């Protein structure tokens, strides 16, 4: 299996087979175990990794940096003020230059087309750290966390609550149905997923036996839920939409009433973070002052409850990103897992 990843880009979930995606999850679990036991796993010894960031980041930057160092590579951060993608230099030219200097390239930004161009012209593996359309490294962490809690993925029901047309919702739908996970999107009709994304997921669901539900009805959405998942109500670049999103998405908040509707004591709660569950941030205070809402997509009660697994999920970003880099770029002594 290892050989099928060598030299490949990691740009979107739809580019991989079920077996490949599940292998990366299992490989990440193996690397996590090595990390916990203090066993070196320097599959990228002597490699140089470029980390390109148009968008700000805490978890993605920290995960790629620590993962690269653990693997023996040198990570070099290039922020929005350091790169000229499409401004003073075309993406194609930038890709060709960076590909001569680095062994692998991570990109976190707005345009999916841009990361695809990097992948087309760099000549080295390119990894999507997030775009407006897809968030594939997050999915590996999410579904690793699910598997750690339930021992399997096939047949699990995951309910995403909130903005059903953002990158996380897109990726949850496609990655989940690819692996046999039932995915429910609980969202207002105005924010239902794009039809093309749903059709793509339906194709995967037909192969895997997964079930898809897109609804604005809470009772329908959480019926049979094993996982409740939410994300911020306003994505990066949409800050002018705060007022309308708060009004529109308040009924889709993950709170204890919604948890109780699921009627599953083994249920877990996931969030890709950051979460606006209180007013202990400048952002949270500002929203509370302007709109009278002290808790947004998830209540503080749920966020701190026994159901919460989001900090495990955040840690798993590092282990899964490590798996992607090692599999696509690593020296070929990766064990079978």
UniProtKB/Swiss-Prot annotation:
Known pathway: Amino-acid degradation; L-arginine degradation via ADI pathway; carbamoyl phosphate from L-arginine: step 2/2
Gene3D superfamilies: Aspartate/ornithine carbamoyltransferase
Disulphide bonds in the chain: none
Catalytic activity as recorded in UniProt: carbamoyl phosphate + L-ornithine = L-citrulline + phosphate + H(+)
InterPro entries per UniProt: Asp/Orn_carbamoyltranf_P-bd, Asp/Orn_carbamoylTrfase, Asp/Orn_carbamoylTrfase_sf, Asp_carbamoyltransf_Asp/Orn-bd, Orn/put_carbamltrans, OTCase_ArgI
EC main group: transferase
Example GO biological process: arginine catabolic process to ornithine
Binding site for L-ornithine: 167, 231, 235-236
Binding site for carbamoyl phosphate: 57-60, 84, 108, 135-138, 272-273, 317
GO molecular function: amino acid binding; ornithine carbamoyltransferase activity
Main subcellular localisation: cytoplasm
Family membership noted in the UniProt record: Belongs to the aspartate/ornithine carbamoyltransferase superfamily. OTCase family.
Name under which the protein is recorded: Ornithine carbamoyltransferase
